[in-house]
Amino acid sequence: MYSLTNAQKDLQLKARDLAQCAFAPTAANTDVTEAYPWANVDRLLTEGFMGMTIPKEYGGQGRSYHDTVIVIEEMAKACATMGRITVEANMGAIGAIMNYGTEEQKKIAAAAVLSGDKPAICISEPNAGSAASEMTTRADRKGDRYILNGEKYWITGGGVSRLHLIFARVFDDGVDQGICAFICVREGNSPENLVVGRRLYAMGVRGIPETHLEFRDLQVHKSMLVVPPGGLKRGFASLMNAYNAQRVGAGTVALGIAQGAFEEAVTYAKERQQFGRPIAEFQGLQWMISDMSIQLEAARLLLHAAACSGESFPDIAMAARAKIFAAETANKVTNDSLQIYGSSGYGRHNPMERHVRDARMFTIAGGTAQILRTQVAGSILDMKLPQTRGGFLPK
């Protein structure tokens, strides 16, 4: 059983106040306009909720992942878009750079996030999704620079992010050295060799653009190489470690969305009258509400446990278990909450249909529930999944 310290309870209340006062009132408009909420991001920054995990010596707060998931849930409960932005501003790319980067790289990344940037982690490609190690974006060594060519797909924050962590297959004198990561900071308008392609309009969490990115002879200095060559044992494994934290964050966004939907459904059940009494008095709905509360609390326990596991990053199996359960719980709870609303919840005037759409992505993005189940099985069986083959091989 987890428990929050007094300091964490204060942090939770601070996050809740900001989310409910500033982000909840604009959530519907963000969904409709599909515009990046710059003003809300500014508030997130000024209130100290960006760069929370960055060490104090680089200007951050040095907070734990446990602290961070407490904040993420509150943000996501008010607005799914702000929940995701909170994840990206504290986990994922920034975590990889702060753990594996040089001093110069850490300073660059910290400065970007602490000025309000949401870093973009660039890994997925049109033909390399779950099988990420099959990526074809390449970086050819030329003197003191690498020349990047290729295409990335479903890049969260494409077009609004300045700091990019780009994963590519490195070639030195034509020899494949494995997968590495590079920092690229986009200043002003996108240069010709870093092309922001078409936006991929999504079903939910619509306030953050998902885009194609194309690299056309993009030059990156060798000093911006974050994860050195080494194939699956070094570069790629390091990337997956950074993803553990991001998966816990994504699962927490799903939890926040579901918790918000659940609370709205409970209020509605108490107020809605049918057959001369509140529908909350009917046993069928009581059982639905009871089951939802059990599932939500179980998801929260798993997420908090995962956030506290591991060393630099959460444990891979714990992160996978937590994300699977939280994401599937969110899909069920939002659908059951809509069911309690009936036809009213199905209408676009009601936030419930938005909650259902927002929750749907989390069994897919950041690792599908099926791939993550394979990771969990691998940890139990002491085996791993080589993504290039799609089957198990001994370690």
Swiss-Prot record:
Q: Which keywords, in A-to-Z order, does the entry hold?
A: FAD, Flavoprotein, Hydrolase, Plasmid
List the coiled-coil residues: none
Named cofactor requirement(s): FAD
Entry EC number(s): 3.13.1.4
InterPro entries named in the record: AcdA, Acyl-CoA_Oxase/DH_mid-dom, Acyl-CoA_Oxase/DH_mid-dom_sf, AcylCo_DH-like_C, AcylCo_DH/oxidase_C, AcylCoA_DH/ox_N, AcylCoA_DH/ox_N_sf, AcylCoA_DH/oxidase_NM_dom_sf
> What domain of life does the native source organism fall in?
Bacteria
- Comment on bound cofactor: Binds 1 FAD per subunit.
Binding positions for FAD per the UniProt entry: 121-124, 130, 153-156, 272, 339, 343, 366-370, 387
Function description: Catalyzes the conversion 3-sulfinopropanoyl-CoA (3SP-CoA) to propanoyl-CoA by abstraction of sulfite. Does not show dehydrogenase activity.
Q: Which family does it belong to?
A: Belongs to the acyl-CoA dehydrogenase family.
Q: Subunit details for this protein?
A: Homotrimer or homotetramer.
Provide the protein name: 3-sulfinopropanoyl-CoA desulfinase
Organism annotation: Cupriavidus necator (strain ATCC 43291 / DSM 13513 / CCUG 52238 / LMG 8453 / N-1)
**What gene is it encoded by?**
acd
